[in-house]
């Protein structure tokens, strides 16, 4: 970002503050004019056009239109906002990365608060299964690209749902010195954190923590669960999105944002609250909890004293976030001979004795399942060494040694892991018994066999 752009952003902020002061002076002047005993004589001299259109004459005295006063009036009378805060909101710009369950409510409330410029970055398309939480979209927009790409904003909201994007967005905010409001939600829980606030240059440990400070190492790939896999309750992600909007509004209205490189020596730097992470749990006895976090880590890769991150790395694409998070390839543990197409399994199941194991969690199995299948959740295989009391041992104890076993899951990933696990336990009888998974899982079952299969 060049110096001219930074100077322009600094000037816009100065204009907003000056307009707020001007509004106060105009209020004082108006009060004096109303008390002036000669006010009637002044009104008599008012031009006919001004008498015909008094609204236009009055509006010229105020920094906002009368419509804006009416729209944001109840917000402006809150002491934490006021006229100055509202003018700051009007001149501010916010970038939302992700227009899904978090981004939709956040965008709605940010726009409703009167933020002047809102950018939305999202390369995904609208899916019908997302409409219960992505409230800006409707069924007639299914398949439409959600948003374009916008840059150069005052605050960034991370409304994505994957570690790779969270690390990427945080790194960019550190390098460009932008505060970041990050949130996540899964099942019945959510978390919220304001990062890089204050947004000081890398190496300045008085700045706010970044995402790498809080999570130096990404979670293992097998531990990452998306809303599509783990499920989400709409109001939960809605709560977190609204809280993101609230944090952004608080930051802007407080006047604590500063342009990159701006150094005002005439006023002390405002004291920032310690970084905390807000934890929300629908089923908890205390739904909201705050966890206090340490500041910037001195050895942080992105913002520490010897930060190794540079804009050139981001521009050139040399920073591989997929590799960093350990997600270099899709799951491919089995050979083609160990996998079977859904249509081929459909033919086999009608003619041959076999065992079909569905490794989805019970809550998903109860939604819909293939007739004759047995449910042994994927979670029961994690850490299991094939003990005698494991459901799999009970199920296969009296099974013919040559009876084939097929494994199915939702998308064809967990089923590969379980198939390999079963072979490692020796259930393939040293190759005498076929054990394989249904390629593509139940999604392929819907595409190739049963078009009426519920897709969730």
From Swiss-Prot:
Residues making up the signal peptide according to the UniProt record: none
Subcellular location: Cytoplasm, Cytosol
GO cellular component, one term: cytoplasm
GO molecular function: ATP binding; metal ion binding; molybdopterin-synthase adenylyltransferase activity; molybdopterin-synthase sulfurtransferase activity; nucleotidyltransferase activity; thiosulfate-cyanide sulfurtransferase activity; URM1 activating enzyme activity
Residues forming the catalytic site: 227, 409
Family annotation (Pfam families): Rhodanese, ThiF
The protein's Enzyme Commission number: 2.7.7.80, 2.8.1.11
Domain Rhodanese as annotated: residue spans: 350-454
Top-level taxon in the UniProt lineage: Eukaryota
Catalytic reaction equation(s): [molybdopterin-synthase sulfur-carrier protein]-C-terminal Gly-Gly + ATP + H(+) = [molybdopterin-synthase sulfur-carrier protein]-C-terminal Gly-Gly-AMP + diphosphate; [molybdopterin-synthase sulfur-carrier protein]-C-terminal Gly-Gly-AMP + S-sulfanyl-L-cysteinyl-[cysteine desulfurase] + AH2 = [molybdopterin-synthase sulfur-carrier protein]-C-terminal-Gly-aminoethanethioate + L-cysteinyl-[cysteine desulfurase] + A + AMP + 2 H(+)
Listed cofactors: Zn(2+)
Chain residues that bind Zn(2+): 210, 213, 300, 303
Keywords in alphabetical order: ATP-binding, Cytoplasm, Metal-binding, Molybdenum cofactor biosynthesis, Multifunctional enzyme, Nucleotide-binding, Nucleotidyltransferase, Transferase, tRNA processing, Ubl conjugation pathway, Zinc
A biological process term (GO) from this entry: tRNA wobble position uridine thiolation
Cofactor note: Binds 1 zinc ion per subunit.
PANTHER family for the chain: ADENYLYLTRANSFERASE AND SULFURTRANSFERASE MOCS3, UBIQUITIN-ACTIVATING ENZYME E1
Family recorded in the similarity comment: In the N-terminal section; belongs to the HesA/MoeB/ThiF family. UBA4 subfamily.
Function text: Plays a central role in 2-thiolation of mcm(5)S(2)U at tRNA wobble positions of cytosolic tRNA(Lys), tRNA(Glu) and tRNA(Gln). Also essential during biosynthesis of the molybdenum cofactor. Acts by mediating the C-terminal thiocarboxylation of sulfur carriers urm1 and mocs2a. Its N-terminus first activates urm1 and mocs2a as acyl-adenylates (-COAMP), then the persulfide sulfur on the catalytic cysteine is transferred to urm1 and mocs2a to form thiocarboxylation (-COSH) of their C-terminus.
Protein name: Adenylyltransferase and sulfurtransferase uba4
Gene that this sequence comes from: uba4
């Amino acid at each position: 970002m060049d110096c001219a752009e930074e100077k322009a952003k600094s000037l816009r902020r100065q204009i907003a503050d000056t307009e707020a002061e001007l509004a106060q002076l105009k209020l004082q002047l108006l009060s004096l004019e109303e008390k002036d005993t000669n006010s009637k004589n002044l009104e008599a001299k008012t031009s006919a056009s001004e008498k015909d259109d008094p609204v236009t004459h009055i509006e010229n005295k105020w920094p906002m239109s009368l419509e804006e006063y009416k729209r944001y009036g109840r917000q402006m009378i809150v002491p934490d906002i006021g006229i100055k805060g509202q003018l700051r909101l009007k001149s501010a710009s916010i970038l939302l990365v992700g227009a899904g369950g978090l981004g939709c409510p956040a965008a709605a409330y940010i726009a409703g608060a009167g933020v002047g410029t809102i950018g939305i970055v999202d390369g995904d398309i609208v899916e019908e299964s997302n409409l219960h939480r992505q409230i800006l979209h409707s069924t007639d927009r299914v398949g439409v690209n959600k948003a374009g790409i916008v840059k150069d904003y005052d605050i960034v909201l991370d409304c994505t749902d994957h570690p790779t994007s969270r690390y990427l967005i945080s790194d960019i905010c550190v390098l460009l010195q932008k505060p970041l409001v990050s949130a996540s939600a899964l099942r019945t829980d959510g978390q919220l954190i304001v990062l890089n606030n204050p947004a000081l240059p890398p190496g300045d440990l008085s700045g706010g923590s970044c995402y790498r400070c809080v999570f130096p190492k990404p979670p293992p790939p097998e531990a990452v669960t998306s809303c599509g896999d783990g499920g989400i309750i709409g109001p939960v992600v809605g709560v977190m999105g609204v809280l993101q909007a609230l944090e952004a509004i608080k930051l802007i209205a407080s006047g604590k944002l500063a342009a990159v490189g701006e150094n005002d020596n005439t006023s002390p730097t405002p004291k920032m609250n310690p970084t905390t992470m807000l934890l929300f749990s629908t089923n908890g006895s205390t739904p909201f909890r705050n966890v206090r976090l340490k500041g910037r880590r001195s050895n942080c890769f992105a913002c520490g004293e010897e930060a190794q991150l540079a804009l050139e790395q981001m521009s050139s694409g040399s920073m591989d976030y997929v590799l960093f998070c350990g997600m270099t390839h899709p799951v491919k543990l089995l050979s083609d001979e160990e996998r079977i197409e859904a249509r081929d399994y459909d033919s086999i199941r009608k003619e041959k004795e076999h065992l079909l194991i569905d490794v989805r969690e019970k809550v998903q199995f109860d939604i819909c399942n293939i007739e004759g299948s047995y449910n042994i959740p994927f979670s029961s295989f994690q850490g299991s060494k094939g003990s005698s009391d494991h459901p799999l041992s009970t199920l296969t104890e009296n099974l013919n040694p040559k009876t084939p076993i097929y494994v199915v899951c939702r998308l064809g990933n967990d089923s590969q892991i379980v198939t390999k696990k079963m072979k490692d336990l020796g259930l393939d009888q040293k190759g005498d018994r076929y054990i394989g998974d249904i390629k593509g899982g139940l999604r392929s079952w819907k595409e190739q066999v049963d078009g009426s299969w519920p897709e969730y």
